[in-house]
């Protein structure tokens, strides 16, 4: 009887709250892991404002490059098909003789199309291809600006030497026409170069962002979470109740 009364007394005593804080188990579904939500929830610095703007305007910059290439190609086709630039003295069409309206248009059109495709499909190989193409277009654009500036100086020098004030003369008309065409192509090339450099910066930023969190580290953290979850859920390691 004494033993039974002691058991009832122990059961009637209030249980003191445990000082050890309870662990909150966070369940992670395989769908969240495969979709990359766990990777996104990891603490990572936010993107810069300028990089976010470039990412959103990637397709627009690609279209700008394509339009620049088409207009430069049209200028080159018209000048080379209508005029015999090889027999014009003064070298006022030196940029056309160098073929810049054609190979510059090829560089800008390729980089523009790759930028649009990579924005829509967002594949790794397309992003890297767009980065390489825009880097090449930046170099081609800088080279083209140098060629056009040299051509513009030669045209202005020709106009100044011959004192071209009567534009109905053939030579003066050619020099003035060359100056206007070269100025427009220079403006378009600067526009295309700005787009190519912006897309190059955007692609480089995406590459650096992708290399910040290694895949091995992510899998290691997943293994730690899985082991902790299995230990908390394993009923075999729980202490058996003490019989009083």
From Swiss-Prot:
Alphabetically ordered keywords of this record: Disulfide bond, IgE-binding protein, Membrane, Phosphoprotein, Receptor, Transmembrane, Transmembrane helix
A GO-annotated cellular component: external side of plasma membrane
BP GO annotations: cell surface receptor signaling pathway; immune response
Location of the protein in the cell: Membrane
Membrane topology (Extracellular): 80-97, 151-180
A Pfam family per the record: CD20
Residues with PTM Phosphoserine: 226
Post-translational modification: Phosphorylated on tyrosine residues by LYN.
Topological type in the membrane: Multi-pass membrane protein
GO molecular function, one term: IgE binding
Keyword field contains Transmembrane: yes
Chain ranges passing through the membrane: 60-79, 98-117, 131-150, 181-200
Modified residues (Phosphotyrosine): 219, 225, 229
PANTHER family for this protein: HIGH AFFINITY IMMUNOGLOBULIN EPSILON RECEPTOR SUBUNIT BETA, MEMBRANE-SPANNING 4-DOMAINS SUBFAMILY A MS4A -RELATED
Biological role stated in the UniProt entry: High affinity receptor that binds to the Fc region of immunoglobulins epsilon. Aggregation of FCER1 by multivalent antigens is required for the full mast cell response, including the release of preformed mediators (such as histamine) by degranulation and de novo production of lipid mediators and cytokines. Also mediates the secretion of important lymphokines. Binding of allergen to receptor-bound IgE leads to cell activation and the release of mediators responsible for the manifestations of allergy.
Family: Belongs to the MS4A family.
Subunit structure: Tetramer of an alpha chain, a beta chain, and two disulfide linked gamma chains. Binds LILRB1. Interacts with FGR, FES/FPS and LYN.
Protein name stated in the entry: High affinity immunoglobulin epsilon receptor subunit beta
Organism of origin: Homo sapiens (Human)
Gene: MS4A2
């Amino acid at each position: 009887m004494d033993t039974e009364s002691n058991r009832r007394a122990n059961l009637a005593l209030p249980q003191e709250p445990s000082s050890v804080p309870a662990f909150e188990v966070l369940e992670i579904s395989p769908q969240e892991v495969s979709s990359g939500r766990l990777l996104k929830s990891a603490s990572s610095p936010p993107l810069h404002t300028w990089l976010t703007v470039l990412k959103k305007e990637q397709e627009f910059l690609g279209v700008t490059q394509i339009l620049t290439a088409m207009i430069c190609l049209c200028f080159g086709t018209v000048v080379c098909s209508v005029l015999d630039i090889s027999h014009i003295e003064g070298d006022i069409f030196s940029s056309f003789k160098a073929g810049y309206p054609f190979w510059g248009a090829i560089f800008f059109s390729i980089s523009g199309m790759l930028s649009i495709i990579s924005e829509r499909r967002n594949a790794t190989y397309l992003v890297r291809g767009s980065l390489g193409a825009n880097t090449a277009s930046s170099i081609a654009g800088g080279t083209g600006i140098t060629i056009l500036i040299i051509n513009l100086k030669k045209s202005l020098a020709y106009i100044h030497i011959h004192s071209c004030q009567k534009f109905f003369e053939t030579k003066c008309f050619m020099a003035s026409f060359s100056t206007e065409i070269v100025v427009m192509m220079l403006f378009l090339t600067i526009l295309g170069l700005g787009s190519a450099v912006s897309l190059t910066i955007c692609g480089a930023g995406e590459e650096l962002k992708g290399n910040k969190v290694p895949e091995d580290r992510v899998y290691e953290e997943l293994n730690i979470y899985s082991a902790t979850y299995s230990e908390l859920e394993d009923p075999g390691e729980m202490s058996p109740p003490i019989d009083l």
